[in-house]
Curated annotation (Swiss-Prot):
Protein name: Cell polarity protein mod5
GO molecular function, one term: protein-membrane adaptor activity
Subcellular locations according to the entry: Cell membrane
A GO cellular component entry from the record: plasma membrane of cell tip
Membrane topology classification: Peripheral membrane protein
Function, in words: With tea1, acts in a positive-feedback loop in the microtubule-mediated regulation of cell polarity. Involved in the anchoring of tea1 at the cortex as well as the correct localization of tea3.
UniProt modified residues of type Phosphoserine: S43, S303, S350
Subunit structure: Interacts with tea1 and tea3.
GO biological process assignments: maintenance of protein location in cell cortex of cell tip
Keyword Phosphoprotein: yes
Signal peptide location: none
Chain spans, region Disordered: 1-83, 119-158, 170-192, 251-285, 300-516
């Protein structure tokens, strides 16, 4: 039964126009323009367009000139009876007012409505059926029974249609949209709801996410091993769980059996089995084994703590990370079943230390909790310092620094305090002995300053070249020696005074390094 059939439950203005409502003016419940309002402003009576030529009515109703099947006789555009008449009062053709009659293929070329992206049917010459509708109408409209009941006839009426059951208009509007956008469902997609993603998509996304998470955990464990490899007793290796195994609980927790229960070891099996898998020959029923494994994995009690540092060798590290995945996917562990680990005691038996291992069962994805807490316990602070980061001290650092400083116990009071001792710091860059450099605190040498070998009894009170050179000598590293035979004023930019200064100054005797140090300290 069509949505537009005669029924008193449907409002009258939603019924098809084949009823008596089409003979009367449009009811006041809706507001809309007439398609054929050629007589706007005139006193001529309005003729229902269903009795006229449907093509002419459609051409005059649109607000753009369209080609006609008849020959144009040169009639005026303003002539209401002409074929090229354009109605300036009609609504413009927008996406909400697209109206295509059932016989548009007869009078227009196929490229007329190319802007609407209308999908025409494959039949080139549509054949008319008994009730006047074409086969193309049936293919676009829907079922032939729905077409025969009169849902199509509302398109040929005099008034603007206001029905909700127009399947054809919905398809035309969908065809006019751009369906090439990948993020949206195209109009060809038939689904109950676009928000319901199918289960295979969800499964594939979940598998991808779990595999990616497994790779991230492997990278994290590699970084962890690199970070703790310099410790005194680093963990030997980190056993990784397989996360994307089917029917595996997530996150996988390491299974450690309780202290009062020793799991039955199957010595007959060639391969070590995980502890959480119940052995059929075990006297313990399978349900209690699963319950104990779940309780050990989920429950966290702070009294559980690894017992001894000496017992956490490679065997206990291998058996401390038993996870509940399949036998075939599980790597072969050598001593997995040979040693049970009941080494858990209460915290009151051990001295209270700063323990980082607050959640002993919580780090299934990085490493075994015993190995991590054991490596972190080697980082305990010194007993006398309250800081968690102990100061890094080396045994021979201060001795090396003190050996560079010249020791003079007798002449401590005569040391010039204004001269800093840079012997234990970074040495100044080595200067070639041909061009002497001077310290920044002393002035540059001038010609008025007396030379080195003048025979003056005492050095002057003003800072002279000799004082500056001795200060610079104290700043230099001990392996750098300076030749003082050259004149001090040779670095002056005046080239004329160089030969005269060389002839005036007698050569100075070069002293040994010990004499220079004594001169500095005196």
């Amino acid at each position: 039964m069509s949505a537009l059939s005669e029924s008193p439950a449907i409002p009258s203005f939603w019924r098809p126009e084949t009823s008596e409502i089409s003979k009367k003016p449009r009811p006041n419940t809706t507001v809309g323009f007439q398609f054929d309002n050629r007589n706007v402003g005139t006193s001529a009576p309005s003729t229902p367009a269903i009795r006229r030529n449907n093509t002419d009515s459609f051409e005059r109703g649109l607000s753009l000139p369209l080609p006609s099947s008849k020959q144009d006789t040169g009639s005026s555009v303003l002539d209401p009876d002409g074929d090229a008449y354009v109605n300036r009062y009609a609504r413009p053709v927008t996406a909400g007012s697209i109206y295509i009659p059932s016989n548009y293929h007869k009078s227009f070329s196929p490229n007329t409505f190319s802007g609407f992206n209308v999908k025409r049917s494959a039949s080139k010459s549509p054949k008319r059926s008994a009730n006047g509708s074409t086969s193309e109408d049936i293919s676009i409209e829907g079922s032939p029974s729905e077409t025969a009941k009169g849902a199509r006839s509302s398109f040929n009426s005099n008034f603007r249609t206001f029905d909700i059951g127009s399947e054809r208009r919905r398809r035309i509007l969908e065809a006019s949209q751009d369906s090439s956008r990948p993020g949206r469902y195209s109009y060809r997609t038939k689904s109950a709801s676009p928000a319901l993603i199918d289960t295979s998509t969800l499964d594939s996304r979940l598998n991808f996410t779990m595999g990616r998470l497994e790779r991230s955990i492997a990278q994290l464990s590699k970084n962890t091993m690199r970070a703790v490899s310099h410790l005194e007793n680093p963990p030997k290796d980190i056993t990784l769980p397989k996360l994307n195994v089917k029917n595996s609980a997530w996150p996988l927790q390491p299974y450690s059996p309780p202290a009062n229960e020793t799991p039955a070891s199957s010595s007959s099996s060639a391969k070590a089995r995980p502890v959480s898998v119940p052995d059929m020959s075990s006297p313990v029923p399978a349900s209690s084994v699963e319950y104990e494994s779940l309780k050990a994995a989920v429950t966290y009690s702070p009294s559980q703590n690894p017992k001894k540092v000496a017992e956490t060798d490679s065997e206990s590290r291998k058996s401390s990370f038993q996870s509940s995945y399949n036998d075939a996917d599980r790597p072969f562990q050598v001593g997995a079943q040979t040693q049970s680990t009941p080494n858990r005691i209460s915290r009151s038996d051990s001295p209270i230390v700063y323990d980082v291992d607050t959640h002993s069962e919580d780090n299934a994805s990085t490493a075994s909790s015993e190995a991590i807490s054991q490596s972190m316990r080697s980082f305990q602070p010194q007993p006398n310092t309250g800081s968690p980061f102990p100061r890094f001290t080396s045994t021979n650092t201060e001795d090396e620094q003190e050996s560079d400083i010249p020791q003079s116990d007798a002449n401590d009071s005569t040391v010039n305090l204004n001269q800093p001792n840079y012997a234990n710091l970074t040495p100044t860059p080595q200067v070639s002995p041909k061009r002497p450099t001077y310290s920044r605190s002393s002035p540059l040498p001038s010609a008025s300053v007396p030379a080195l070998g003048d025979g003056s009894p005492d050095p002057p009170a003003a800072p002279s070249i000799q004082n500056s050179l001795s200060v610079h000598e104290s700043e230099m590293p001990p392996h750098v020696t300076r030749d003082y035979t050259q004149p001090a004023a040779s670095a002056t930019p005046v080239p004329k005074e160089k030969p005269s200064e060389k002839s005036e100054k007698p050569p100075k005797k070069k002293g040994s390094k010990l004499e220079k140090f004594c001169c500095i300290l005196m």
